[in-house]
Amino acid sequence: MGGCFCIPRERSLTRGPGKETPSKDPTVSSECIASSEYKEKCFLPQNINPDLTLSFCVKSRSRRCVNGPLQEAARRRLWALENEDQEVRMLFKDLSARLVSIQSQRAQFLITFKTMEEIWKFSTYLNLGYVSMCLEHLLFDHKYWLNCILVEDTEIQVSVDDKHLETIYLGLLIQEGHFFCRALCSVTPPAEKEGECLTLCKNELISVKMAEAGSELEGVSLVTGQRGLVLVSALEPLPLPFHQWFLKNYPGSCGLSRKRDWTGSYQIGRGRCKALTGYEPGEKDELNFYQGESIEIIGFVIPGLQWFIGKSTSSGQVGFVPTRNIDPDSYSPMSRNSAFLSDEERCSLLALGSDKQTECSSFLHTLARTDITSVYRLSGFESIQNPPNDLSASQPEGFKEVRPGRAWEEHQAVGSRQSSSSEDSSLEEELLSATSDSYRLPEPDDLDDPELLMDLSTGQEEEAENFAPILAFLDHEGYADHFKSLYDFSFSFLTSSFYSFSEEDEFVAYLEASRKWAKKSHMTWAHARLCFLLGRLSIRKVKLSQARVYFEEAIHILNGAFEDLSLVATLYINLAAIYLKQRLRHKGSALLEKAGALLACLPDRESSAKHELDVVAYVLRQGIVVGSSPLEARACFLAIRLLLSLGRHEEVLPFAERLQLLSGHPPASEAVASVLSFLYDKKYLPHLAVASVQQHGIQSAQGMSLPIWQVHLVLQNTTKLLGFPSPGWGEVSALACPMLRQALAACEELADRSTQRALCLILSKVYLEHRSPDGAIHYLSQALVLGQLLGEQESFESSLCLAWAYLLASQAKKALDVLEPLLCSLKETESLTQRGVIYNLLGLALQGEGRVNRAAKSYLRALNRAQEVGDVHNQAVAMANLGHLSLKSWAQHPARNYLLQAVRLYCELQASKETDMELVQVFLWLAQVLVSGHQLTHGLLCYEMALLFGLRHRHLKSQLQATKSLCHFYSSVSPNPEACITYHEHWLALAQQLRDREMEGRLLESLGQLYRNLNTARSLRRSLTCIKESLRIFIDLGETDKAAEAWLGAGRLHYLMQEDELVELCLQAAIQTALKSEEPLLALKLYEEAGDVFFNGTRHRHHAVEYYRAGAVPLARRLKAVRTELRIFNKLTELQISLEGYEKALEFATLAARLSTVTGDQRQELVAFHRLATVYYSLHMYEMAEDCYLKTLSLCPPWLQSPKEALYYAKVYYRLGRLTFCQLKDAHDATEYFLLALAAAVLLGDEELQDTIRSRLDNICQSPLWHSRPSGCSSERARWLSGGGLAL
């Protein structure tokens, strides 16, 4: 749309002074030759990369640097969107670009374009700042939008490679094959090619068509209309897409820039100016002045126009003044705040939606409506009641949703037309479409206070007295207010000034006769005005040549008189429009320039003709030719105003966007932003509609006000932006909060207390919806102050809302401070319902304070008031609150009775979303009571009913509560793995719809565990899928520990699924993630758990050594985690024993035994020495094994405390007996050990073990070893450890 690129940059507004004569050079002027190779290369097909990188960074305005936490949050959000990029694609589709990929690590998007229109629109949105604002919509959540200070301080800055963007633009331009260029220099074709090649002047505009690659192109001059070949080296494509679009869609001729014209950096001016040189007029309508004379500027003087309207301060005469004859530094330039339009014109743009102001205000009051003064609140219910679902009645008509349409209508070029008196059919059709289909002259009864009653009977044309009234009426010298209706394009003069004609032809005949009498009577002004009226009526009948004659006659009659400037302007502009329609530019080139000056230089002038757009287009073409941004801006504004008045909204957008780029400074840009938001809303572009109002809001922070109709527009469009389900009754997006705050500030300036209060209530509703009661309390406190100023009812309602917000913020004491005085202020004669409402809220506050008895009394009083007025709903709420109070007080039986009664009362009510959501909460409480009373079937039924009601209304939060309860029921109360998985899956779906990424990650983790517990091939595969999805989310959320554990879980699952090649990969990723987080305890834990994967498995168990010995042990030593190190050495010992690596096992067991003596835990020491004894035994080091076993026995308590200790004694002494007898060949010591084992077995009461030991003793006594050594003589062996040695 009407935009420019950062690159190509706008060149100097003067592209070379003056119109140059053709060069004597037979080809081109010398200044073009140097760059001919480059220019030819630009027009040749090139293999360019069609993708563009869009980078962004989040910056703090106050600190002027990157906001690190927000930048990281935005990057993580982008990472989450990489695999689910539908939302991003839709955003860039609105921004007229195509998403190729997302590069979250670099905070970049890769986009591409297929047409020049796409790159034009995108570059426009980029330069208007809409791309960065739309990225805010995408990347920031409600927490950001609710933080007003953060929003005001934060901006997203986007950047692209401007040169690459220009390259893509030129490539697409050439690909389309038809575009417009500017002549870089004067060109005269050689004699042999005369007639075949074009003769060009410098800066001349040419329409070019690409046929095939070569040094010459076919072109048509927009100045002469001639067709021919032109050298590529002499041309430069117009760098601005808006200019290409405009020249293609509004075809027509244009002039050349003149040598003595000044444009440059000059602004539109007004006031007085000084003549550089004197001027002798060539026409009667031009002003005569001398050098140095002071000239008063009537309206504006605009750089790029040949003329402006001036008044001589010496003679008082008014006429056209050639712009080049005045000193551009002598006039007063327009301020930056109104660079191209007057204050009245700016207000006309701002008033675009003002007719909807009352309706929009009504909508805000409806949105703010609450039933808190008549409806009881349920304990735990999270928001102030919302207004009714059907808001269509209060929805302003002009802001209904519309289906997406085209950005603008494509206009087809009109073919060449004959300039004869009879117009061709295509011209007639075009003009007929611009005029009304039929017209009925009104009867006298239709009119209010007509100016004239005209009547012309047959045969009265010759009687002068019959025309005296109209001639006297029209022959006023200069302008009068009653002539205003003559010049508007609605032909209102037919109803406001004349009547009594039933047919238009009859009226035309009367005017024609009047013209003749005016001419005879030399009544100049009446004659001119009658010609003007006849010309306008001829245009209505598409008789352009006839109209042209009338207008030319009127101008001739005026003879340069400017007393009625409105008449002069309307005559010139209408005649110029006809010249352009009939292709008669050669006949009226001077008049075209003067008509353009009257059109552009006179502010606040009402449009007089629908085909005035042709003159506006001519002025805009001239602005493009001379490179005058002020003239281009002024022409764009005129096009906007005219098209809006004609209701052709689709055609306005390109001009409005271009004008916004050219304006740049408020309040002019503010006025155009207002138009843009209106148009984007019409075209169903919600991102852009909100972004344009945000732009307005930024300016509003600098002192501008935000209209209420734009707030309504934002409220409508923000609900379309977010991917949540369609918002229910009264829900407002947090994205609207900044604009609501701006509107609130504007209402404070206007002292509009009623709307202020409505906005405060809406803002509080948003904060409560997002569980930010502190923000709600802030705005409700304001609403209370405003309510007290507005009236008792508003004050009462605001007080209740504030008390409810305090309750939701768990500030029961403050709620009591509001409610108790409110109750005292109510008279006994006041509404019973209002007293009941206060008692109910008092009950909630007292319950929050833990004052159960007083809370119960308040609830009962509220119940009594509801019963007195017969309000079943309020009775149900009071019963439910009593039940909840009883439940919290562990009074199960009363709780059950109250809640059952509440359910019965709710069932009597007519079903609605509000009551059903309350019933969900009651069912959950009742289920809790029933389950705690072991009525599991009935409790389950209540849980399922709660879920059913939530599903019925598609209410996510109630479904979430019910689903949580069902998951707990099937996991802990009545375990059922399959049902538990089913409800966890539904819980996951709800989390995804709510976009709660943290909840989604936790649920995927839980689901992975549940599927893993089923231990089937299919469940393991599903578990792996869940773990991988949770991993992606944890990385997105920056939860390093969770991400590392997810990697570990994935490795564990790959091991169970025997996908060994992926196990090490996942385990290493888990450890690296932990190490990068610089959390050594997490890394230590993961090293150990990674080793456990192999240690607890059946395959590749030796891989555990690497994770234990090389990873966990060094970290444990560095962290001085002695117990962890001991546990790992114990695992290493056990692992090596199972692998029969006894030498290694001895090393690890020895280290474990040493560490165990440091811990001070005898049990750990006992385990370590027992393992060491086992290793020595396996290595056939029996004496050391005996010593270690004896050491373990010395660590046991002296008195047996349990059968387990007795069993341990029996087994160890039995092992020592066998070891001593069989390996050490000491029968006497073996006997002692067996006797001790027998004693332990007797204490244990194990008859079988006793028999085995007695059998062993008998065998020893009968063995040769028993007799080979004297009785009582034991062999001498090492007893270092068991003898009290302190070190191994």
UniProtKB/Swiss-Prot annotation:
Query: Which residue stretches does the UniProt record annotate as biased composition, category Polar residues?
Result: 386-395
**Start and end residues of each stretch annotated as Disordered:** 386-405, 410-444
| GO annotation (BP), single | regulation of intracellular protein transport
- The protein's superkingdom reads Eukaryota
Recorded hits in InterPro entries, A to Z, give: SH3-like_dom_sf, SH3_domain, SH3TC1/SH3TC2, TPR-like_helical_dom_sf, TPR_rpt
Query: Which residue numbers delimit the SH3 domain?
Result: 176-240, 268-331
UniProt cross-references to Pfam families, sorted A to Z: SH3_1
State if Repeat is listed as a keyword. yes
TPR repeat segments: 528-561, 757-790, 836-869, 1001-1037, 1084-1118, 1119-1152, 1166-1199, 1210-1244
- Keywords from the named record: Charcot-Marie-Tooth disease, Disease variant, Neurodegeneration, Neuropathy, Repeat, SH3 domain, TPR repeat
Q: In which tissues is it expressed?
A: Strongly expressed in brain and spinal cord. Expressed at equal level in spinal cord and sciatic nerve. Weakly expressed in striated muscle.
Q: Does the keyword Repeat apply?
A: yes
Give Gene Ontology CC terms. Answer: cytoplasmic vesicle; plasma membrane
Q: Which disease is it linked to?
A: Charcot-Marie-Tooth disease, demyelinating, type 4C: A recessive demyelinating form of Charcot-Marie-Tooth disease, a disorder of the peripheral nervous system, characterized by progressive weakness and atrophy, initially of the peroneal muscles and later of the distal muscles of the arms. Charcot-Marie-Tooth disease is classified in two main groups on the basis of electrophysiologic properties and histopathology: primary peripheral demyelinating neuropathies (designated CMT1 when they are dominantly inherited) and primary peripheral axonal neuropathies (CMT2). Mononeuropathy of the median nerve mild: A disease characterized by median nerve mononeuropathy at the wrist. The clinical presentation ranges from a mild phenotype, consistent with carpal tunnel syndrome, to a severe median nerve mononeuropathy at the wrist associated with evidence of a more widespread axonal polyneuropathy. The latter phenotype is similar to that of patients with hereditary neuropathy with liability to pressure palsies.
According to UniProt, the name of this protein is SH3 domain and tetratricopeptide repeat-containing protein 2
